[in-house]
């Protein structure tokens, strides 16, 4: 029925996809995340920050953002926050429900770079990974700020600990150094995503050595496990995409969705809702690698800005980690804090799920939030490149070329 051409197309899709250098960054970022998880950097920062900020709800959100900026692995973030913050906050008398929600909501912020799902999403949508990282950075920080505003309305126990400003400065430097190496080098055009991931992995090893908590063997084994799952799904999705396209499945989907009597923004909303529902039974690699390519022709036909849509989709995928009854974040948290009831954890995540949905609505109303920073970086980097090209130009060769 399919013919030899289908298998030829599947083969070429497979080779072309795996030869994309963006995928080479995946194991490095995962490895960096597992090294950081065991290095003890975050625990030290939490111990010093709690004396300065006072409100541990806010401290957990700040730490969650820093973990996301340094690692981008959901399981590691939630597990680390649960082990580190939950017992201390319960001992001080913080609200258990809000504590669980803050840890789950903060730990699920996988869209903040360097994010492994974004690395996979960029080539799937034919986007530049640097543009995508820049696009999600501002909305990600916006969501973190919305979390803080929500938590600030709740009362908190008073703390008698004296602020340790000097210790905070010392403890924040290692993570700041790592984030600057990874994120700064990419956003300002100093390194590709693969090079930045390599620098980040090397930097994480150095910091773990300095902290005396390097667990290289365990980190390598976990990196191999996680990377194998992601890459296996990538291989399967490429073959599926080739067969699906050859059989005309994409045409059927495009025609069906385009025939709906609704405006393009509503069509995009329907696609995001479908992706959210698919995120319940499936992990994010399946949604991004298998189902997203099916919807791409519809988005192209309706002239949807792919960068803006990718940012919205990243938040949607992030929201699935907080949506009962399949919210994976709740099971990560239950594993490290077994005394918390699973039903209570589910209820605690719902306000943070609605905050993320509100962020998507804001992006629909003000799409420039997702696009202005990538555009700014393009202008800034192009100015630098033009200046460099002007300084190293060779007018005699340019004249020879013009004469010819």
Please place each PLM-identified region on the residue numbering.
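Alpha-helical transmembrane segments of multi-pass membrane transport proteins
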Residues: 1-404
């Amino acid at each position: 029925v399919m013919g030899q051409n289908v298998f030829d197309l599947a083969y070429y899709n497979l080779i072309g996809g795996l030869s994309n250098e963006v995928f080479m960054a995946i194991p490095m970022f995962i490895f960096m995340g597992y090294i950081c998880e065991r290095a003890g950097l975050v625990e030290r920062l939490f111990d010093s920050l709690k004396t300065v900020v006072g409100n541990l709800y806010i401290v957990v959100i700040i730490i969650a953002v820093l973990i996301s900026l340094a690692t981008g692995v959901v399981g590691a973030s939630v597990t680390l926050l649960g082990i580190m913050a939950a017992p201390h906050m319960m001992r001080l008398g913080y609200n258990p429900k809000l504590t669980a929600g803050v840890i789950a909501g903060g730990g699920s912020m996988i869209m903040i770079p360097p994010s492994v799902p974004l690395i996979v999403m960029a080539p799937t949508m034919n986007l530049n990974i640097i543009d995508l990282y820049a696009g999600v950075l501002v909305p990600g920080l916006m969501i973190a700020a919305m979390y803080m505003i929500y938590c600030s309305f709740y009362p908190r126990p008073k703390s008698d600990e004296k602020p340790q400003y000097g210790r905070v400065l010392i403890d924040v430097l290692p993570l700041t150094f790592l984030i600057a190496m990874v994120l700064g080098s990419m956003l300002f055009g100093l390194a590709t995503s693969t090079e930045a991931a390599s620098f980040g992995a090397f930097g994480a090893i150095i910091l773990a050595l300095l902290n005396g908590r390097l667990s290289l063997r365990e980190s390598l084994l976990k990196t191999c496990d996680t990377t194998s799952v992601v890459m296996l799904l990538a291989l399967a999705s490429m073959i599926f995409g080739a067969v699906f396209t050859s059989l005309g499945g994409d045409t059927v989907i495009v025609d069906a969705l385009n025939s709906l009597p609704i405006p393009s923004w509503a069509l995009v909303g329907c696609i995001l809702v479908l992706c959210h529902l698919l995120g319940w039974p499936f992990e994010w690699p399946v949604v991004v690698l298998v189902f997203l390519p099916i919807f791409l022709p519809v988005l192209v036909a309706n002239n949807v800005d792919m960068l803006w849509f990718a940012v919205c989709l990243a938040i949607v995928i992030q929201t699935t980690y907080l949506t009962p009854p399949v919210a994976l974040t709740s099971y990560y948290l239950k594993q490290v804090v077994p005394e918390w009831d699973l039903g209570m954890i589910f209820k605690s995540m719902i306000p943070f799920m609605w905050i993320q949905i509100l962020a998507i609505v804001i992006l629909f109303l003000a799409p420039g939030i997702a696009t202005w920073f990538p555009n700014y970086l393009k202008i800034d980097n192009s100015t630098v490149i033009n200046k460099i090209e002007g300084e190293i130009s060779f007018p005699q060769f340019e004249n020879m070329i013009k004469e010819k």
